[in-house]
From Swiss-Prot:
Origin superkingdom: Bacteria
Descriptive protein name: Phosphoserine aminotransferase
Positions where N6-(pyridoxal phosphate)lysine occurs in the chain: 199
GO MF entries: O-phospho-L-serine:2-oxoglutarate aminotransferase activity; pyridoxal phosphate binding
Species whose genome carries this gene: Janthinobacterium sp. (strain Marseille) (Minibacterium massiliensis)
Length: 363
């Protein structure tokens, strides 16, 4: 059966080399006679997988030694609660958290944070339907905030930070679920980075948390032990049974990325892929994307047909061409092409060619 180009926003496409290797090792991991899915998480085989996975991630992102890598469960949605529970405990209560609201996922984080702290919306792009990132000089920060939170890429609106904000001595926390490993970043500018795996890392089930060591030990008394970063770190991400198979696939993805040349090489490919789509969108009025160039996401490209009555035809005909999962989020409609690291440039070329043909046919 021919493989399709999968533009799903998540769970997203995996590198074909990773899928092939996982298939080959499914029933017998490297001569062990075991599938990774049935290994003891404390056995020699999985301990090796875990250590290699964490070491490769540290290498890919140049993570400094004073940062811990935690492999957790619950996705970024769970971290919306876990982050404040871990960071506000040492502050006078109620603590204040500053948020920059750039869209759907930022809003979800803010909604959850109200349960644990006072919330200050330091900046928001809601005035223009979340189509931009507010300039840093417009932010109204709280001097003694527990932390400042940003979502570096909004998958629904297709809005991405093109800068790392300077927030002074207040810890900067970032949800990087949809653009981690897609561009080079300076980890030392952040106190905490978290990311669900199912976009640029692997299948759903494991959540990456990168936390500076001075951020440990500040949990609220109500924080469940399994979600206390200090305890998770002390138990090497095995306070409870970890999501072993998603960790294994994440490890294969990290090794694939290293073979491609690492994050710097991936970033150049991602720039090229995004440019192909945006250049075409800017050349026509048949399709519309309203995000300013500086804030356009390299990972998620939403676009709309000027004649929305053609939406159904677009999806049906794209599916027939092996271009799948292009329907936009239900909250905004239209179309969305998610072009994470695993999407080859050939897939983007095929999509743009289809879009041009569709315009000729119906424009």
């Amino acid at each position: 059966m021919k493989r399709v180009y999968n533009f799903s926003p998540g769970p997203a496409a995996l590198p074909q080399e990773v899928i092939k290797q996982a298939a080959e090792e499914m029933t017998n991991w490297r001569g062990s006679g075991l599938s990774v899915m049935e290994m003891s998480h404390r056995g020699r085989e999985f301990t090796e997988i875990l250590a290699t996975t964490k070491a490769d991630l540290r290498s890919l992102l140049s993570i400094p030694d004073n940062y811990k890598i935690l492999l957790m469960q619950g996705g970024a949605i769970a971290e919306n609660a876990i982050v404040p529970m871990n960071l506000v405990g040492s502050k006078a209560q109620p603590a204040t958290i500053d948020f920059v609201n750039t869209g759907h996922w930022s809003s979800k984080t803010i909604e959850e944070a109200h349960k644990y702290a006072k919330v200050n919306i330091a900046a928001s792009s809601e005035d223009k339907d979340f189509t931009y990132v507010p300039a840093r000089d417009t932010w109204k920060l709280t001097p003694d905030a527990a932390y400042v939170h940003i979502c570096t890429n909004e998958t629904i609106g297709g809005v991405e930070f093109d800068f790392t904000p300077d927030v002074g001595n207040v810890p900067l926390v970032a949800d990087m679920s949809s653009n981690i490993l897609s561009r080079e970043i300076d980890i030392s500018k952040y106190a905490v980075i978290y990311a669900g795996a199912q976009k640029n890392i692997g299948p759903a089930g494991v959540t990456i948390v990168i936390v500076r060591d001075d951020m440990l030990g500040h949990a609220l008394p109500i924080c469940p032990s399994a979600f206390d970063w200090k305890l998770v770190d002390e138990h090497d991400s095995m306070f409870n049974t970890p999501p072993t198979y998603p960790i294994y696939i994440a490890g294969l993805t990290f090794q694939w990325m290293l073979r491609q040349g690492g994050v710097a090489a991936m970033e150049q490919v991602n720039i090229a892929k995004a440019k192909l789509i945006y250049d075409y969108l800017d050349s026509t009025d048949f399709y519309v994307n309203s995000v300013p160039a500086a804030n356009r996401s390299r990972m998620n490209v939403p676009f709309f047909l000027k004649d929305e009555s053609l939406n159904g035809k677009f999806i049906t005909e794209a599916d027939a061409q092996g271009l799948v999962q292009l329907k936009g989020h239900s909250s905004v409609g239209g179309m969305r092409a998610s072009i994470y690291n695993a999407m080859p440039i050939e897939g983007v070329q095929a999509l743009v060619a289809f879009m041009k043909d569709f315009e000729k046919k119906y424009g």
